[in-house]
Design a protein with these regions (language model features):
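Conserved RecA-like P-loop NTPase helicase motor core
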Residues: 171, 413, 418-515, 521
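Walker A/P-loop
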Residues: 99-120
Length: 558
């Protein structure tokens, strides 16, 4: 363990293996017991600042423990809960006040579950005098962790108080870092938020870690409060094992009696049977969709119809497509590559400005966006793969071909994922569209914003239908035109089919600024047609420009 002299502190660092530039920076030591690099001193050298621990990370938690004081938290523009979100928070806290150990939040994509979860966790922790809140998130961690960090910081800003809560955000794949060598948790969790809880529907190492960290086998009265979140809990009730202790509590049983969740349900008449170490529908249920739906309803309603409700569901309203922004945090190496390109851009732009060469300036801007797009391809691919694992078909919208559409498609196909390509001058665009619509290719990469249908359930000319698999959309690059952005989202968000969209952008780069322009245009176009701009107002808060009235933005963009 590092020795910390009086008047100094330790910084734990996220350094790549082998150090920087092939060597270890001066003053940095790797500590096997911490599985981290550390620097001890009175201040952190500027060259090491990009590698310092992030707020609410497990590395920061270790760092705070070593120093005996807490490092700075994150900051973000305040967020305000909508009335229905406040109602959900009140329902969750009411269940906690009644002594229930868990609530499951199953609202649709785009309804603001993250904001609800953070607000509810804060309220429950305050009421209980608790301190430590664990949040587990799904892949890709470089998108999901920053998103949760921003939401926590935003609500801290809204409250305007320091509640001294200790948040730890972990990807489900990293939960082992919170376990000691004896297999026990290294910290006592008071409140846990398990996002995308369907990750834990099967027996696995990470499921075992989650169960131990949340003390699922502990008596109900001593267990931490757990909020599980997913709109897609599993293919059948036998996969809802992450709620086993809650079902035990509702039935007045000890948790151990429901630890084998599939067995407990089967013993109570749910049509399940074991198969290759897992539970699945019985032969009778496999032949009857009605039997399956009835069984799901019966098991779900135990929580949904309970007083107080222990499962919350809220459908996404028809109207504007659910739209949010995911700002990706580049790795230090990616940042270095970006900053080199940024320096080249500034020099080129200065020459263009001096010579009043508009074409040269625009060309420099395009090159920078191309480079920024290339750096982030792997993040878009990771986001798409995560949504495929959740049961969606994925749309990826791009503007550029050689530095966006093509590399994204190539990387997905290299991982064995078929991709429909609707970009460039592809003469087989319709055949590619049909590959996606019929489910032969679960991903479509396209830059055609109009005149194509990509929604679920489309009826074809021959009377057959597209797959009913829900769609999920990503903008790999921001669209400067609000109309084109709306039309792009409308490729799958149409005909009573909901398709949530996210803009992926690298935080602190030209892409983030492009996203601000895109957001402004979207608000302007929505306002000009008297549409509901509330969805896009949520995104404005991410960028910290929610102080600009939508109508004023529309006037300025006139």
């Amino acid at each position: 363990m590092p020795t910390i002299p009086a008047g100094q502190r330790v910084w734990l660092l996220e350094l790549p293996w082998g150090g920087l530039g092939g060597g270890m920076p001066a003053g940095v030591t790797y500590y096997k017991s911490l599985t981290a690099h550390a620097y001890v001193g009175t201040y952190l050298p500027e060259a090491l600042e990009p590698y310092s621990s992030k707020a609410y990370s497990s590395l920061r938690w270790q760092e705070d423990e070593l120093n005996g004081t807490e490092g700075p938290g994150a900051t973000a523009a305040p967020m305000t809960l909508r009335p229905e979100q406040r109602a959900d928070v009140e329902a969750i806290t009411a269940a906690a006040d009644r002594g229930f150990r868990q609530v499951h939040l199953a609202n649709d994509v785009g309804t603001g579950k993250t904001l609800v979860a953070v607000a509810a966790a804060k309220a429950i922790a305050r009421a209980r005098g608790a301190r430590t809140i664990l949040v587990t998130v799904d892949r890709p961690a470089r998108i999901t962790i920053p998103s949760w960090r921003r939401t926590i910081a935003a609500l801290n800003s809204t409250d305007g108080v320091d509640d001294e809560l200790r948040w730890i955000i972990m990807s489900s794949d990293s939960l082992g870092k919170l376990m000691a060598r004896n297999g026990r948790p290294r910290l006592k969790v008071d409140v846990a938020v398990i996002d995308e809880a369907h990750q834990f529907r099967h027996a696995s190492k990470r499921t075992s870690y989650m169960r131990r960290l949340t003390r699922m086998d502990a008596p109900h009265e001593t267990a931490p409060f757990v909020l599980t979140i997913t709109a897609t809990p599993g293919h059948h009730p036998g996969e809802w094992g992450y709620m086993s202790s809650l079902y035990a509590q509702v039935h007045g049983d000890p948790p151990a009696r429901w630890a084998d969740f599939g067995r407990a349900l089967a013993d109570r008449g749910v049509p399940l049977e074991p198969s290759y170490g897992k539970w699945t529908w019985s032969a009778e249920a496999k032949d009857s969709l009605q039997t399956q739906q009835a069984a799901i309803s019966d098991v779900r309603d135990i929580l949904l119809r309970h007083d107080p409700p222990l499962m919350l569901t809220r459908s996404a309203p028809w109207g504007p497509p659910p739209f949010d922004v995911d700002l990706v945090e580049l790795t230090p190496d990616q940042w270095r590559a970006y900053e080199l390109e940024w320096g080249d851009f500034q020099r080129e732009m200065q020459l263009a400005r001096t010579g009043k060469n508009v074409a040269r300036g625009l060309a420099a801007l395009v090159r920078l966006r191309q480079k920024a797009s290339m750096i982030r391809v792997e993040h878009t691919v990771a986001a798409a793969k995560a949504e495929l694992a959740r049961g969606y078909q994925v749309l990826i919208a791009t503007e550029m071909v050689t530095t966006a559409a093509h590399p994204v498609a190539e990387m997905l196909e290299a991982d064995g994922i078929p991709v429909a390509r609707i970009y460039g001058s592809n003469p087989d665009a319709e055949a590619e569209r049909m590959r996606f619509q019929r489910g032969e290719a679960p991903v479509v990469v396209f830059n055609t914003p109009t005149a194509i249908n990509l929604q679920a359930g489309e009826q074809f000319a021959d009377g057959t239908y597209a797959t009913d698999t829900p769609r999920r959309g990503f903008f790999h690059q921001a669209r400067y035109s609000g109309l084109l952005a709306e039309q792009t989202m409308g490729r799958a968000h149409r005909n009573h089919q909901i398709c949530a969209w996210s803009l992926l952008a690298a935080a602190g780069t030209i892409e983030e600024r492009a996203g601000t322009v895109m957001l402004s245009r979207l608000i302007a176009s929505a306002t000009s047609t008297d549409a509901d701009a509330s969805t896009f107002s949520e995104v404005a808060r991410v960028f910290g420009i929610d102080w600009i009235p939508a109508a004023r933005l529309a006037d300025e963009l006139g």
